[in-house]
């Protein structure tokens, strides 16, 4: 494309030049480079008739460039204007898809669903398969965010089928990200791994494909409570972030993943340094869900530093930011982290109430992985004790939680991350467990629990 632009003469052949510029627009979109996209779109619009296919497509995608470049309000205004000019036909599908994409990233979730569903429906009216795939991929993310996970999975299946018959692979990682995340949260590790393989099989160098593939892998690792692995997977995103939509609050939910993993991996100074610029940018944009996600990571950090009052403020501010938004998964996530932090600070009764709230949401979502983690937290808190087997006689709730996880094969470090305590504390409990149960090793404990 670089050579094509170098040899075309815009003055003598503006139509061809507009077509080349339009190809650069699409290239910039999947490189997640907003400023470049806007620049090429403006060139295309300057060369093409505003009502020509190249002109309309450039205008329809230009708003996505504004969004990725840090101008979400301008992007929304651009689509409002464009939707009044392009109301019918295949080109209208591009406009409504782009509008839904922007609406979702900007927390306008209900309108995003309406727009994206309209774009999908337009497929039967002569719409583009490529645009339909983008709409399906982002619609699946909408369904995930609001807790409609069965519909999200169904939407992914629809996208998979269309990708297979069309041969268009660019949206496959975006589709498989949703599939992998839901499968991991539901404890279907085989399906999660299969989704990641499907994404990896088509992922090349384009950021729009690399980013969701890495997010899928990282969110599986987080569901496994392997925070060191989560951090390692997410680190490449930090390296590729400058100049891309990764820097935009709410676009890709990776900063809270990284910050949370840093805190739970004991890298507190690194977590603070990482959070600050993302918090500043989210405040500047006024992005509620991004601030809420960063806020729960900040709350984790305050808790790890022993400042429970600051931690409480951060978590409560996050929940307030989410109030009125239909983001059920994010709400459960904040409550779970809040409850863990309260329990670590010795606020068992308060922790019990908050974790119970998280558990109710996770249960309604079918997020069995986190329901089980909530149950372990509640058991460790000691306020909801249940009768165990004769092998467990004499174990405290915290010892029982440690014994269960160790018997499953987790290392002390992994148990510590799961229960939000230090590895030294895990070893202390493990020594007591061995003495009480009359075993001498992890393998003997596992055998006793079979």
Residue ranges and their predicted role:
Residues 2-10, 42-49, 79-87, 117-128, ...:
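Amphipathic alpha-helical segments of tetratricopeptide repeats
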Residues 1-174, 182, 291:
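Internal alpha-solenoid helical repeat scaffolds
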Residues 304, 308-314, 340-398, 413, ...:
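Linker/hinge segments immediately adjacent to helix-turn-helix/homeobox DNA-binding domains
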Residues 313, 337, 379, 385-440, ...:
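Helix-turn-helix DNA-binding segment
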């Amino acid at each position: 494309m670089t050579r094509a632009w170098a040899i075309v003469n815009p003055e003598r052949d503006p139509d061809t030049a507009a077509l080349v510029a339009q190809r650069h627009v699409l290239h910039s979109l999947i490189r997640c480079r907003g400023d470049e996209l806007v620049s090429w779109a403006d060139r295309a619009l300057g060369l093409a008739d505003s009502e020509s296919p190249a002109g309309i497509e450039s205008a329809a995608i230009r708003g996505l460039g504004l969004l990725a470049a840090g101008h979400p309000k301008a992007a929304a205004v651009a689509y409002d204007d464009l939707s009044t000019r392009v109301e019918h036909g295949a080109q209208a599908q591009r406009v409504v898809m782009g509008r839904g994409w922007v609406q979702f990233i900007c927390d306008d979730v209900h309108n995003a669903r309406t727009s994206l569903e309209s774009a999908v429906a337009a497929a039967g009216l002569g719409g583009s398969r490529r645009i339909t795939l983008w709409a399906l991929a982002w619609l699946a993310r909408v369904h995930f965010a609001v807790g409609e996970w069965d519909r999200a999975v169904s939407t992914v299946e629809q996208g998979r089928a269309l990708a297979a018959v069309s041969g268009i692979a660019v949206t496959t990682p975006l589709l498989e990200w949703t599939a992998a995340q839901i499968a991991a949260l539901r404890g279907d590790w085989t399906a999660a791994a299969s989704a990641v393989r499907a994404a990896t099989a088509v992922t090349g160098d384009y950021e729009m494909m690399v980013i969701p593939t890495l997010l899928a892998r990282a969110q599986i690792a987080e569901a496994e409570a392997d925070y060191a692995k989560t951090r390692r997977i997410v680190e490449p995103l930090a390296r590729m972030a400058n100049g891309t939509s990764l820097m935009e609050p709410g676009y890709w939910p990776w900063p809270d993943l990284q910050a949370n993993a840093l805190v739970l991996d004991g890298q507190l100074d690194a977590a603070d340094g990482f959070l600050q610029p993302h918090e500043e940018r989210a405040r500047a944009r006024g992005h509620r869900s991004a601030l809420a996600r960063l806020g729960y990571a900040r709350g984790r950090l305050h808790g790890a530093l022993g400042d429970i009052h600051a931690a409480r403020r951060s978590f409560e501010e996050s929940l307030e930011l989410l109030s009125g938004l239909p983001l059920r998964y994010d709400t459960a996530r904040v409550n779970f982290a809040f409850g863990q932090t309260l329990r670590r600070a010795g606020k068992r009764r308060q922790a019990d109430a908050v974790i119970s709230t998280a558990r109710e949401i996770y249960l309604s979502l079918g997020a069995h992985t986190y329901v089980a983690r909530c149950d372990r937290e509640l058991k460790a808190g000691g306020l909801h004790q249940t009768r165990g087997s004769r092998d467990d006689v004499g174990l405290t709730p915290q010892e029982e939680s440690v014994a269960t996880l160790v018997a499953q094969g987790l290392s002390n470090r992994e148990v510590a991350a799961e229960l939000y305590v230090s590895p030294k504390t895990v070893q202390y409990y493990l020594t007591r467990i061995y003495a009480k149960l009359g075993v001498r090793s992890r393998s003997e404990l596992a055998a006793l629990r079979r």
